[in-house]
């Protein structure tokens, strides 16, 4: 029977001899179960397959078989006998059993009334004998059952076999279904009964010969021993079908009584709000094994008022019926936009786009708003005939300097007219013009113009002279091919601007500083049907000069924007491994203010919010009963179509694109919309062959083909260029990207941000659960509400973070495109800010470095170095290229120059006041202080440039001064404002601060167009010098102690308890430092009452603050908060607890005792399973797609991501996502915790919490790797404890942490050699001298000779040194394990010498391996390949390879001092002379007698040891190092 069960669900057979045989077997089995009869053999059940189940053929035979069947079956149709329309046509194809075809029968002898693809001839006689008498079924229900193959009404909508019926028969079927629905309305209780009835059929049952069962099953609904038939009360019609009766009979007979107990054994015990998962199973031996999760699961009911869905429903309640027309309605009323009195058009620009290739090259498209009465409508401005602007840098012979000076003087003296002067310049440049003309003609450029102009250049190209000079300006159309960027000629040395884009040229020439009002003086309109865009209006401008910035005396307000949030719900196609869309929710905010924040009350105002959802049923499922009525009711209630149903993904996409076009959105919002939703949307449109006239409505440009969607998208760079071109005209606001820029969070998922920022609890739905939600209207409504809620949350997050006004301010300051700012393009913002500034000063702008030029320069760099130089990237100081195209090299480049100065901290716990002083905006202030600019400092290829001698301010200092002065004025206004105006001003000052602080970064960013390494190096050099001079001033002149300094700040230990005296010192220091500088200002950033200083960039302190004149205290952490590291919440909580004890705990003894008690308490709670499971969750961010990790098997979060993606969870496990995991071991297999790697034992929290899970939290791992490193690091400077003691409190083996304790207490081994009080203390960390007996191979440790002799003379008990060794060995030179009378145990002097030499060689070899270990307790990275990155003051090769995740320093695991100490210990063991000199005369005589016998035996070994030690350079001092 078991064998039949294993195969019967996968196939169906017609009646015949096999069916009869199975029936006989079933009856015999029934008799056996009832009468206790056993077969004669007594061996249990005899189960065998008489015939093979499958035929094995190759592809050619299979194709021939299908063709033959199709030919034989041609014209074969089985009619249903009643209507003749429900027959089946056999096409000769094999059935694909991998596809679901409705609920499958588990009875092979009968298909239970199901239509499974082949119509079987049934014999009435057999049916009557096998099946009991049933009531007469309603004809309509019977017809429906024939269609769907199910005796249950709801399966008509979920059975895939229903899809196979011909399209021409739909009308008849719909009539039948309407009749059924009119007669029968099933309720939810019917579904539950039917579900309970079918549950036993889903339980895995394994039959063993000893009748013992081993299984784990869910406890849901397992109390009934017999299935309850489902009955529809309305018509008194029994819906029991043949399948369920026979199936239930068989299973109730086969399953023993103890099995039903087993089915309910997976129980949940609740204690208060916490749940403990307990799984109880029976083993094959009948012994119960109980597995209990060793952590609690929080089961507190969340406040329904804080539910995100509740918040969305509240917001949706504000949408009145009068607003229904807003969604999906076209513009009414006026059809013409407003014009000014002079006929010009006012146009507010939001976005711009240009086609880089094709026929439209050189044409740009501006998208924005025009005023139409009291409203604003979308408009597209097509700008044509934009000209290239290329500058040719002439050789010195073209414009001789002496002639130019004479001509300019004649013009100045009015002896030469300006026209004549220009004519002279043209004559000088004739040769240059002819050469350029020839180059243009070769490119088929027929229309161009050239003119000599005077321009400045001040950037980094060595082939372009710096300063003011005459160059040749070349203008020709963008439709023509560009001149090569590396083109040179006889009369010119370089070309600049040849590849500048038309859009950049237009923005700079027209001085457009971000979104603003433009004035279009001359234009032509076109109808929407003839236009190139989907905007409401479209105008064409033939010359860019017709567009100017609007200068209006009256204040012009910004138009509101239409903001649309999109959320997709997808399922995973497992065969193709792609995401498919099943629902799309759209939320539209019709009047969003873009320049000022919008508080919550204003956002909730009725009439500005609308929503829409379109859903389609997944393949193989249908819509639940009454779904159409539910949709109709929802639409009627809202007064418009807010819910639409479709039958295919293609139809869903078409409807979505149509609705988006009707909304005419300006901004698209979503969480990770640029990384997931937008990509999936367009990929599916492409796969479903959606017409370009439809999918292009996602943007505002009409398109005939889809751009390449995949492109070079770096981590955190937003959407790919292909995706951005598809939505051209609409801005993209990704709240995922924005939150990463504006917030510091552990996780940036929508769920976590909703909780931390909006105080809303979001419900997540797994992609694998979505198809199940189509089984009932209730769950399907839940799915739709979840999609709408997610869209609402992303929009609320955008408003909460004030993303639109902040990015608008940044864009208006910088003058770039708003869409780029929203995508996080910080470098481009600063780039455009400088482009606008230098362009207005008549400077030739630096070109972008193209990929081709990068490869050329990279090849040149590689050729400049010798082949054997493997450290090119580290030695190369000119890091022109950040992304080296040579993929083969994984070597990371070090910094091109030294960074900020970081002083070595004076570690310890300070209980007196500590001052933190820092310079305000150090690097921007240095630029102003020393007049550092492209235009003021001459640069050379080698060396750091000197400070400028010119007092004329450069362009960069002026920019900095301008930004700083504006910010100061804004901050002054903030003091007078409150409420919304204060909020608005605060956003503006933030934007100014971000721009000023980013200015220095562009100088040191190698991919920036304004990259200037000499300037960046000079700025950081001055910063280091300023910090050092400040430290010297404080220490030498003010006699204060500086305990730490970092880049722009210093910490001063006051040594005082009086806060007033500390304030006086603060004022004195600030005054003395600030009077030395003009622009640099130092200020107090904090007063700390108590501070724990651990190491560089790692400290914690109690910060004293004054609010309303009253002091208050708060703990401030830096580098010890463990927010962005792979630490669990438990580690963070224990770290915070230890910090609070240290910083508030009083005396050192009290602090240590409190920490020890807390550690023992938490250990007990963890061992007893009293810690919440959520506290064990570790989070780590994926920096790239999981499949792209080369070392994925050693990365826990990558392994979890890969496993979850295999199960269909695509969202949340991609690059930039934070993956949660718990380190576990399998229940009943505790040995796996030590044998399997960490990555193999990492599990997602949902995997651990799932019912039936066999995973337990690995408590030992969390104690040893999550808690001990954190606590030991925090307590490193606390007297009275040690890593060993902390480990003991946590129940760990203290011996494993002994070396760490020794390292902490004796960082310099020479200290213990010189100042130790005894030999035992001096050599306590050394390895013992171990000798091996040649006879019995026993190894034993040898004490020192002197201690062994003294012990034998005095007859005292063995010292600690000799406890683990034989104290009489040196007197007998005999193996302590061998018999004394046996001569085989004697160890000769040669043996001693050889074994000592071998051990010494091992220590020397260990030293020369050069193993490095990271000093950070939480990292402990071990390597033999040092990282040659330069970082601050650190020595080359000491930076941890895990930087920046780890800021630790690599240290030698076995240092030269360790080797010297070990060799000294061996010398001490074998010493027979020096130790005698320290003894009293009386004792010395006795010892000397014993030594005379031992000395010859160890002489050779002692000589070898001394010789090795003397060769160690550590024991020698070079006189050259101490002689002046």
UniProtKB/Swiss-Prot annotation:
<dbReference type="Pfam" id="PF03104">
    <property type="entry name" value="DNA_pol_B_exo1"/>
</dbReference>
<dbReference type="InterPro" id="IPR045846">
    <property type="entry name" value="POLBc_alpha"/>
</dbReference>
<keyword id="KW-0238">DNA-binding</keyword>
<feature type="compositionally biased region" description="Acidic residues">
    <location>
        <begin position="79"/>
        <end position="96"/>
    </location>
</feature>
<dbReference type="GO" id="GO:1902975">
    <property type="term" value="P:mitotic DNA replication initiation"/>
</dbReference>
<feature type="binding site">
    <location>
        <position position="1333"/>
    </location>
    <ligand>
        <name>Zn(2+) 1</name>
    </ligand>
</feature>
<feature type="binding site">
    <location>
        <position position="1375"/>
    </location>
    <ligand>
        <name>Zn(2+) 1</name>
    </ligand>
</feature>
<dbReference type="InterPro" id="IPR038256">
    <property type="entry name" value="Pol_alpha_znc_sf"/>
</dbReference>
<dbReference type="InterPro" id="IPR036397">
    <property type="entry name" value="RNaseH_sf"/>
</dbReference>
<dbReference type="InterPro" id="IPR006134">
    <property type="entry name" value="DNA-dir_DNA_pol_B_multi_dom"/>
</dbReference>
<feature type="binding site">
    <location>
        <position position="1378"/>
    </location>
    <ligand>
        <name>Zn(2+) 1</name>
    </ligand>
</feature>
<dbReference type="GO" id="GO:0009965">
    <property type="term" value="P:leaf morphogenesis"/>
</dbReference>
<dbReference type="GO" id="GO:0000166">
    <property type="term" value="F:nucleotide binding"/>
</dbReference>
<keyword id="KW-0808">Transferase</keyword>
<dbReference type="InterPro" id="IPR024647">
    <property type="entry name" value="DNA_pol_a_cat_su_N"/>
</dbReference>
<keyword id="KW-0539">Nucleus</keyword>
<dbReference type="InterPro" id="IPR006172">
    <property type="entry name" value="DNA-dir_DNA_pol_B"/>
</dbReference>
<dbReference type="GO" id="GO:0003677">
    <property type="term" value="F:DNA binding"/>
</dbReference>
<feature type="region of interest" description="Disordered">
    <location>
        <begin position="1"/>
        <end position="53"/>
    </location>
</feature>
<feature type="zinc finger region" description="CysA-type">
    <location>
        <begin position="1333"/>
        <end position="1378"/>
    </location>
</feature>
<feature type="short sequence motif" description="CysB motif">
    <location>
        <begin position="1414"/>
        <end position="1446"/>
    </location>
</feature>
<dbReference type="InterPro" id="IPR012337">
    <property type="entry name" value="RNaseH-like_sf"/>
</dbReference>
<dbReference type="InterPro" id="IPR023211">
    <property type="entry name" value="DNA_pol_palm_dom_sf"/>
</dbReference>
<feature type="binding site">
    <location>
        <position position="1440"/>
    </location>
    <ligand>
        <name>Zn(2+) 2</name>
    </ligand>
</feature>
<dbReference type="GO" id="GO:0003899">
    <property type="term" value="F:DNA-directed RNA polymerase activity"/>
</dbReference>
<keyword id="KW-0548">Nucleotidyltransferase</keyword>
<dbReference type="InterPro" id="IPR043502">
    <property type="entry name" value="DNA/RNA_pol_sf"/>
</dbReference>
<feature type="compositionally biased region" description="Basic and acidic residues">
    <location>
        <begin position="20"/>
        <end position="30"/>
    </location>
</feature>
<dbReference type="Pfam" id="PF08996">
    <property type="entry name" value="zf-DNA_Pol"/>
</dbReference>
<dbReference type="Pfam" id="PF12254">
    <property type="entry name" value="DNA_pol_alpha_N"/>
</dbReference>
<protein>
    <recommendedName>
        <fullName>DNA polymerase alpha catalytic subunit</fullName>
        <ecNumber>2.7.7.7</ecNumber>
    </recommendedName>
</protein>
<dbReference type="GO" id="GO:0003887">
    <property type="term" value="F:DNA-directed DNA polymerase activity"/>
</dbReference>
<dbReference type="GO" id="GO:0005634">
    <property type="term" value="C:nucleus"/>
</dbReference>
<feature type="binding site">
    <location>
        <position position="1414"/>
    </location>
    <ligand>
        <name>Zn(2+) 2</name>
    </ligand>
</feature>
<dbReference type="GO" id="GO:0008270">
    <property type="term" value="F:zinc ion binding"/>
</dbReference>
<dbReference type="InterPro" id="IPR015088">
    <property type="entry name" value="Znf_DNA-dir_DNA_pol_B_alpha"/>
</dbReference>
<dbReference type="InterPro" id="IPR017964">
    <property type="entry name" value="DNA-dir_DNA_pol_B_CS"/>
</dbReference>
<comment type="function">
    <text>Polymerase alpha in a complex with DNA primase is a replicative polymerase.</text>
</comment>
<feature type="binding site">
    <location>
        <position position="1336"/>
    </location>
    <ligand>
        <name>Zn(2+) 1</name>
    </ligand>
</feature>
<dbReference type="InterPro" id="IPR042087">
    <property type="entry name" value="DNA_pol_B_thumb"/>
</dbReference>
<dbReference type="Pfam" id="PF00136">
    <property type="entry name" value="DNA_pol_B"/>
</dbReference>
<dbReference type="InterPro" id="IPR006133">
    <property type="entry name" value="DNA-dir_DNA_pol_B_exonuc"/>
</dbReference>
């Amino acid at each position: 029977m078991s064998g039949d069960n294993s195969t019967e669900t996968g196939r169906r057979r017609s009646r015949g001899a096999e069916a009869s045989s199975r029936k006989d077997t079933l009856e015999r089995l029934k008799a056996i179960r009832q009468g206790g009869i056993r077969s004669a053999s007594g061996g249990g059940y005899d189960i065998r397959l008489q015939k093979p189940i499958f035929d094995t053929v190759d592809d050619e035979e299979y194709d021939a078989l299908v063709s033959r069947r199709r030919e034989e079956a041609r014209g074969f149709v089985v009619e249903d006998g009643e209507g003749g329309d429900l027959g089946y046509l056999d096409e000769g194809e094999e059935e694909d059993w991998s596809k679901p075809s409705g609920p499958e029968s588990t009875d092979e002898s009968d298909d239970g009334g199901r239509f499974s693809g082949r119509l079987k001839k049934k014999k009435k006689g057999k049916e009557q004998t096998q099946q009991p008498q049933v009531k007469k079924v309603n004809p309509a229900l019977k017809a429906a059952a024939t269609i769907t193959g199910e005796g249950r009404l709801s399966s008509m909508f979920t059975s895939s076999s229903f899809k196979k019926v011909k399209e021409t028969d739909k009308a008849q079927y719909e009539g039948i279904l309407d009749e059924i629905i009119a007669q029968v309305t099933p309720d939810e209780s019917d579904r539950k009964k039917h579900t309970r009835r079918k549950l036993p059929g889903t339980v895995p049952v394994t039959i063993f010969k000893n009748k013992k069962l081993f299984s784990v099953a869910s406890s849901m609904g397992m109390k009934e021993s017999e299935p309850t038939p489902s009955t529809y009360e309305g018509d008194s019609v029994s819906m029991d079908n043949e399948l369920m009766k026979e199936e239930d009979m068989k299973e109730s007979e086969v399953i023993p009584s103890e099995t039903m107990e087993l089915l309910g054994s997976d129980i949940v015990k609740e204690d208060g709000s916490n749940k403990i998962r307990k799984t109880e199973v029976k083993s094959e031996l009948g012994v119960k094994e109980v597995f209990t999760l060793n952590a609690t699961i929080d089961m507190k009911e969340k406040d329904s008022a804080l539910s995100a869905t509740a918040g969305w429903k509240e917001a949706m309640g504000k949408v009145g019926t009068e607003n229904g027309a807003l969604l999906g309605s076209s513009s009414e009323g006026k059809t013409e936009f407003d014009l000014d009195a002079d006929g010009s058009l006012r146009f507010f620009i939001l976005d711009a786009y240009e086609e880089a290739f094709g026929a439209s090259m050189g044409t740009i498209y501006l998208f924005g708003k025009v005023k139409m009465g009291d409203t604003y409508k979308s408009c597209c401005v097509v700008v044509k005939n934009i000209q290239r602007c290329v500058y040719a840098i002439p050789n010195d012979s073209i414009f001789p300097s002496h002639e130019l000076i004479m001509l300019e003087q004649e013009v100045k003296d009015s002896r030469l007219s300006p026209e004549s002067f220009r004519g002279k310049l043209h004559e000088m440049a004739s040769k240059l013009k002819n050469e350029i003309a020839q180059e243009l003609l070769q490119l088929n450029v027929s229309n161009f113009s050239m003119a000599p102009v005077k321009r400045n250049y001040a950037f980094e190209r060595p082939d372009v002279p710096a300063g003011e000079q005459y160059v040749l300006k070349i203008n020709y159309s963008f439709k023509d091919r560009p001149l090569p960027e590396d083109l040179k000629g006889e009369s010119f040395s370089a070309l600049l601007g040849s590849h500048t884009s038309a859009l950049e040229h237009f923005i700079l020439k027209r001085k457009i500083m971000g979104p603003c009002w433009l004035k279009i003086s001359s234009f032509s309109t076109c109808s929407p049907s003839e236009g190139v865009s989907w905007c409401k209006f479209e105008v064409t401008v033939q010359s860019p000069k017709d567009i100017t910035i609007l200068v209006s005396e009256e204040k012009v307000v910004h138009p509101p924007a239409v903001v649309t949030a999109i959320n997709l719900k997808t399922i995973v196609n497992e065969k193709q491994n792609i995401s498919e869309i099943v629902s799309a929710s759209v939320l539209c905010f019709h009047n969003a203010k873009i320049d000022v924040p919008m508080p919550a009350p204003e956002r909730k105002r009725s009439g500005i919010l609308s929503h829409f959802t379109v859903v389609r049923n997944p393949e193989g499922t249908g819509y639940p009963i009454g779904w159409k009525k539910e949709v109709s009711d929802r639409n009627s209630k809202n007064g418009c179509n807010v819910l639409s149903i479709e039958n295919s993904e293609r139809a869903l996409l078409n409807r979505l694109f149509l609705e988006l076009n009707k909304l005419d959105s300006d901004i698209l919002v979503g969480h990770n919309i640029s990384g997931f939703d937008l990509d999936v949307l367009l990929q599916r449109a492409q796969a479903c062959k959606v017409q370009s006239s439809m999918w292009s409505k996602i943007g505002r440009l009409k398109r005939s083909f889809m751009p390449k969607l995949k492109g070079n998208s770096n981590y955190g760079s937003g959407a790919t260029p292909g995706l951005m071109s598809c939505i051209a005209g609409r801005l993209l606001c990704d709240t995922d990207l924005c939150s990463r820029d504006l917030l510091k969070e552990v996780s940036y998922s929508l769920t976590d941000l909703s909780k931390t920022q909006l105080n809303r609890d979001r419900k997540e739905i797994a992609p694998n659960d979505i198809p199940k939600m189509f089984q009932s209207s209730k769950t399907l409504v839940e799915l739709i509400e979840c999609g709408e809620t997610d869209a609402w949350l992303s929009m609320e997050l955008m408003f909460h973070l004030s993303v639109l006004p902040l990015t608008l301010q940044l864009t208006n300051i910088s003058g770039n495109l708003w869409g780029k700012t929203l995508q996080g393009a910080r470098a481009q913002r600063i780039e455009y800010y400088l482009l606008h500034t230098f362009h207005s000063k008549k400077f030739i702008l630096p070109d972008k470095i193209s990929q081709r030029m990068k490869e050329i320069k990279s090849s040149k760099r590689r050729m400049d170095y010798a082949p054997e130089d493997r450290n090119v990237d580290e030695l190369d100081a000119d890091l022109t290229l950040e992304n080296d195209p040579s993929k083969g090299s994984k070597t990371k480049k070090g910094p091109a120059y030294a960074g900020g100065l970081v002083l070595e901290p004076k570690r310890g716990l300070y209980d007196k006041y500590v001052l933190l002083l820092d310079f305000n905006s150090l690097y921007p202030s240095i630029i102003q202080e020393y007049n550092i600019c492209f235009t003021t400092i001459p640069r050379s290829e080698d060396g750091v440039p000197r400070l400028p001698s010119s007092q004329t301010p450069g362009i960069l200092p002026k920019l900095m001064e301008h930004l700083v002065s504006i910010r100061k004025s804004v901050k002054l206004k903030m003091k007078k404002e409150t409420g919304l105006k204060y909020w608005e001003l605060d956003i503006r000052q933030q934007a100014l601060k971000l721009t000023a602080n980013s200015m220095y970064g562009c100088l040191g960013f190698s991919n920036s167009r304004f990259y200037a390494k000499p300037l960046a190096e000079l700025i950081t050099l001055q910063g280091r010098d300023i910090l050092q001079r400040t430290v010297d001033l404080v220490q030498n002149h003010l006699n204060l102690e500086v305990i730490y300094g970092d880049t722009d700040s210093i910490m001063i230990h006051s040594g005082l308890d009086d806060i007033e005296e500390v304030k006086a010192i603060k004022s004195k220091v600030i005054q003395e430092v600030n009077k030395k500088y003009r622009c640099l200002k130092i200020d107090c950033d904090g007063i700390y009452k108590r501070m724990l200083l651990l190491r560089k960039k790692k400290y914690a302190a109690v910060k004293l603050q004054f609010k309303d004149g009253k002091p208050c205290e708060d703990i401030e952490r830096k580098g010890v908060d463990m927010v962005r590291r792979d630490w669990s919440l438990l580690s963070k909580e224990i770290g915070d607890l230890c910090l609070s004890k240290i910083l508030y705990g009083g005396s050192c003894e009290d602090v240590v005792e409190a920490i020890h008690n807390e550690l023992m308490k938490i250990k007990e709670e963890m061992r007893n399973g009293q810690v919440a499971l959520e506290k064990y969750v570790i989070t780590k961010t994926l920096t790239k797609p999981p499949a792209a990790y080369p070392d994925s098997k050693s990365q826990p979060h990558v392994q979890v991501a890969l496993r979850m993606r295999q199960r269909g969870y695509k969202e949340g496990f991609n690059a930039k996502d934070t993956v949660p995991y718990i380190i576990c071991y399998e229940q009943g297999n505790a040995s796996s915790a030590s044998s399997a790697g960490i990555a193999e034992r990492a599990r997602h929290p949902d995997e651990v919490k799932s019912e039936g899970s066999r995973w337990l939290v690995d408590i030992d791992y969390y104690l040893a790797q999550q808690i001990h490193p954190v606590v030991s690091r925090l307590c490193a400077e606390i007297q009275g404890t040690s890593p060993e003691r902390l480990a003991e409190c946590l129940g760990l083996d203290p011996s494993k942490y002994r070396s760490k304790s020794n390292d902490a207490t004796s960082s310099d081994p020479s200290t213990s050699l010189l100042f130790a009080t005894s030999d035992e203390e001096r050599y306590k960390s050394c390895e013992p001298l171990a000798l091996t007996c040649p006879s019995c191979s026993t190894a034993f440790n040898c004490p020192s000779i002197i201690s062994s002799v003294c012990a034998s003379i005095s007859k005292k008990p063995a010292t600690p040194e000799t406890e683990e060794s034989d104290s009489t060995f040196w007197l007998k030179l005999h193996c302590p394990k061998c018999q004394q009378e046996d001569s085989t145990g004697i160890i000769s002097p040669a043996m001693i010498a050889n074994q000592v030499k071998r051990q010494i060689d091992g220590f020397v070899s260990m030293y020369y391996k050069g193993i490095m270990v990271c000093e950070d307790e939480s990292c402990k990275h071990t390597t033999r390949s040092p990282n040659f990155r330069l970082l601050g003051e650190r020595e080359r090769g000491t930076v941890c390879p895990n930087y920046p995740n780890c800021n630790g320093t690599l240290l030698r695991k076995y240092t030269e001092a360790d080797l010297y100490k070990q060799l000294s210990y061996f010398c001490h063991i074998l010493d027979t002379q020096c130790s005698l000199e320290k003894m009293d005369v009386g004792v010395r005589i006795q010892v000397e007698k014993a030594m005379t016998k031992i000395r010859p035996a160890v002489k050779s070994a002692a000589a070898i040891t001394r010789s090795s030690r003397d060769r160690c350079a550590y024991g020698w001092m070079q006189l050259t190092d101490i002689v002046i």
